[in-house]
């Protein structure tokens, strides 16, 4: 910098005054430069001196480092040894603390057990049980912790002791202390740990909890089943009743049972827990159902069912439908909820469905086998209505069964339920169709009509049977059976069948049976030689069929036109033929246009009188015979039909008789014959009154000839 200033001064033009000043400045700059050079030289000397000192210091440090290095290695070894010992000692100390905790918990467990044994109040006892289980769970956790860490702790401690003994890294006192700690832990492991797990207070507590579990489960009883009439109505109210009223146990009881089951499962007692639960709850469920007195379930084979009297079987089936509903919708539904509440947390909820099915399987099997026995028994006609009751009951129960026994564990029960329903449907359809076949071909189709021409029992039975089947109680169920059967038989239904309603199916089926009944009647007609009896039989039978179906649900199903054409028309035709064959012969006897009378009119009056008397005598003789047959053999049980036939006969005979008497009264002076009014009374007596008529076919004895003679 001074050099630049000097050069600047030299380059500037100088005056005389300024030259002196410049020289002065130059001299000053020179002096400064000289001083600076001296300082630099001195500094160079100082630096050389410091370099020498640094070399000496570096040599000293190197020597010290060589002397300290062994001590540093020894310190690091000491720290590593301390770390290794601490890693073994710390878990051992924690293990000892856990032993102390386990000992404390065992003392608490003894105190709680003593208090629990003296407590009599149920609610307080349940609360103490919860405290007891809390202590058991804590003790179990402590013992499990000991069992998990004791072996690794012993192994680490043993490695440290062996290392110290081998390397002499610690003093004898410390080594001896570690060796004694190792021996103590080994002794605890070999004796107390297994005893704590399998033979100590924990094991006793688990046994005690098993007993408490069983006792508490036994206390959860199903309420009195009582009157089951409400179950016949169904509906939402009934469902709500099941949902609300049939819970088992209080919340506290359920909580205690749940805690016990979880604790037992956590202590390798799951199998014992399940065995106790299934045994006790099956016992309770079965005992509740036994109060309904289901003794009828003892008979379940088809052969045994066939041997039962019908009244007993009918009652048994009715009870079966009721009891099956109670068992499913009350008892087993309650058991499922209890099972889910108590065992639902074990193995992520996989246990409780299996347990519930074990409880339910035997109960459901008893009901299944009775239903299967009924379905496989003889297909007697009267069983149809009870089979339909069973089917309707199963249909109502189906959604409950499928919901209660959902999942893989309940598949077998659901499958057997569906199989039972199939058996009932198949049995119902077979009973119905075999009934039609029996009517047509076997029952009494080849026998002649009843001797009095009354309605055969098979007709009465069949008509009333079908009337009952057509009522609101059964027509829908029977139609559903027929529809299901048709679906089974044909995978691809014809279009005509697809459009056919359930009512059409039922109508077609009933028409088939009615037609079979008509063929049965026809076979009886053909086997009878008495034409009058045949017509009375046909008239009575078809009139009965018409009147019993008219204005009924069966008549509505068949249709008014059908029953008029099929039954009423036949009855009217038979009535006409009956009158023609039974009574028209009397009209012909008194026929005034008879050729004999015409011939006699051309002759003598005496001959006419004789012929008239012969005709009138023949008339009354035939009348007596016909009336006697009506009184003794022929029967028209229906009052209205009998009155109609009486009135029709009176209209047929009395006018002809009156005209004959009026025309030939002059030839009948020697004898007195009944008046037309008297004849009308005699005909009415021949047909009989309601009181005189024997509805079983028998008629009051005695001859009408006596009455005729008295009336003369």
Curated annotation (Swiss-Prot):
Biological process per Gene Ontology, one example term: protein transport
Glycosylation sites: 111
Subcellular location: Cell membrane
Primary location recorded for the protein, binned into one broad class: membrane
Keyword Membrane annotated: yes
Family matches, as InterPro entries: Cullin_repeat-like_dom_sf, Exo70, Exo70_C
Disulphide connectivity of cysteines: none
Signal sequence range: 1-18
Entry coiled-coil feature ranges: 26-53
Molecular function GO labels: phosphatidylinositol-4,5-bisphosphate binding
Disrupted gene: phenotype observed: Abnormal arbuscule development (reduced arbuscule branching and aberrant hyphal branches frequently distorted in shape) during arbuscular mycorrhizal (AM) symbiosis with AM fungi (e.g. Glomus versiforme) characterized by reduced STR and STR2 incorporation into the periarbuscular membrane (PAM). Normal root nodules development during symbiosis with rhizobium bacteria (e.g. Sinorhizobium meliloti).
Induction: Accumulates in roots, in a RAM1-dependent manner, during colonization by arbuscular mycorrhizal fungi (e.g. Glomus versiforme). Triggered by RAM1. Induced during root nodule symbiosis with rhizobium bacteria (e.g. Sinorhizobium meliloti).
Transmembrane segments: none
Family of the protein in this entry: Belongs to the EXO70 family.
Purpose: Component of an exocyst subcomplex specifically required for periarbuscular membrane (PAM) biogenesis during arbuscular mycorrhizal (AM) symbiosis with AM fungi (e.g. Glomus versiforme), especially critical during the early branching phase of arbuscule development; probably involved in STR and STR2 delivery into the PAM.
The protein's name: Exocyst complex component EXO70I
Gene: EX70I
């Amino acid at each position: 910098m001074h050099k630049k200033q000097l050069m600047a001064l030299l380059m500037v033009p100088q005056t005389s005054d300024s030259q002196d000043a410049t020289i002065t400045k130059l001299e000053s700059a020179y002096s400064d430069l000289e001083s600076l050079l001296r300082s630099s030289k001195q500094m160079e000397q100082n630096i050389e001196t410091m370099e020498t000192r640094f070399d000496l210091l570096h040599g000293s440090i190197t020597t010290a480092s060589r002397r300290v290095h062994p001590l540093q290695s020894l310190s690091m070894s000491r720290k590593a040894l301390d770390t290794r010992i601490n890693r073994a000692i710390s878990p051992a100390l924690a293990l000892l603390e856990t032993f102390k905790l386990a000992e404390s918990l065992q003392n608490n467990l003894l105190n709680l057990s003593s208090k629990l044994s003296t407590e009599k109040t149920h609610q307080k006892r349940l609360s103490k049980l919860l405290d007891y289980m809390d202590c058991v769970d804590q003790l179990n956790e402590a013992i499990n912790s000991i069992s998990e860490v004791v072996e690794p702790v012993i192994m680490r401690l043993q490695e440290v002791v062996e290392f110290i003994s081998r390397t002499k890294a610690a003093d004898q006192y410390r080594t001896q202390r570690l060796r004694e700690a190792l021996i103590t832990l080994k002794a605890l492991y070999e004796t107390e740990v297994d005893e704590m797990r399998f033979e100590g207070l924990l094991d006793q507590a688990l046994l005690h909890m098993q007993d408490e579990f069983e006792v508490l489960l036994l206390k959860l009883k199903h309420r009195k089943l009582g009157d089951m009439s409400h179950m016949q109505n169904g509906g939402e109210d009934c469902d709500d009743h099941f949902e609300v009223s049939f819970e088992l146990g209080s919340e506290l009881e359920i909580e205690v049972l749940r805690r016990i089951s979880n604790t037992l499962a956590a202590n390798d007692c799951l199998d014992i827990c399940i065995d106790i639960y299934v045994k006790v709850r099956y016992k309770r469920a079965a005992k509740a159902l036994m109060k309904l007195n289901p003794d009828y379930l003892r008979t379940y084979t088809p052969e045994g069912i066939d041997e039962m009297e019908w009244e007993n079987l009918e009652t048994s089936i009715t009870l079966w439908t009721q009891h099956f509903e109670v068992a499913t919708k009350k008892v087993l539904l309650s058991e499922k909820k209890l099972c889910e509440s108590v065992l639902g947390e074990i193995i992520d909820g996989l246990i409780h469905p299996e347990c519930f099915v074990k409880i339910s399987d035997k109960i459901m099997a008893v009901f299944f086998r009775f239903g299967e026995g009924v379905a496989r028994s003889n297909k007697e006609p009267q069983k149809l209505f009870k089979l339909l009751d069973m089917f309707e009951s199963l249909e109502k129960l189906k959604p409950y069964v499928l919901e209660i026994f959902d999942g893989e564990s309940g598949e077998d029960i659901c499958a057997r339920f569906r199989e039972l329903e199939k058996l009932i449907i198949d049995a119902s359809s077979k009973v119905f169709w075999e009934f039609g076949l029996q009517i047509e071909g076997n029952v009494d189709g080849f026998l002649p009509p009843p001797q009095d021409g009354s309605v055969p029992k098979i007709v009465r039975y069949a008509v009333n049977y079908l009337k009952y089947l057509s009522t609101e109680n059964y027509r829908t169920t029977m139609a559903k059976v027929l529809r299901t059967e048709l679906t089974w038989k044909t995978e691809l239904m014809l279009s005509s069948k697809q459009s056919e309603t359930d009512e059409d199916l039922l109508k077609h089926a009933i028409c088939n049976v009615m037609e079979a009944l008509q063929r049965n009647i026809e076979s009886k007609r053909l086997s009878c030689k008495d034409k009058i009896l045949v017509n009375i039989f046909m008239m009575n039978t078809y009139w009965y069929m018409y009147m019993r179906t008219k204005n009924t649900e069966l008549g509505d199903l068949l249709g008014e036109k059908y029953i008029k054409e099929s039954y009423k028309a036949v009855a009217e035709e038979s009535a006409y033929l009956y009158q023609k064959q039974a009574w028209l012969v009397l009209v012909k006897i008194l026929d005034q246009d008879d050729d004999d009378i015409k011939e006699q009119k051309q002759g003598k009056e005496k001959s006419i009188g004789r012929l008239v008397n012969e005709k009138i005598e023949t008339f009354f003789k035939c009348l007596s015979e016909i009336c006697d047959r009506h009184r003794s053999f022929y029967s028209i049980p229906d009052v209205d039909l009998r009155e109609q036939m009486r009135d029709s006969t009176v209209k047929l005979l009395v006018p002809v008789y009156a005209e004959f008497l009026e025309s030939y009264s002059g030839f009948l002076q020697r004898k007195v014959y009944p008046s037309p009014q008297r004849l009308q009374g005699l005909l009415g007596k021949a047909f009989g009154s309601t009181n005189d008529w024997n509805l079983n076919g028998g008629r009051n004895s005695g001859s009408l000839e006596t009455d005729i003679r008295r009336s003369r």
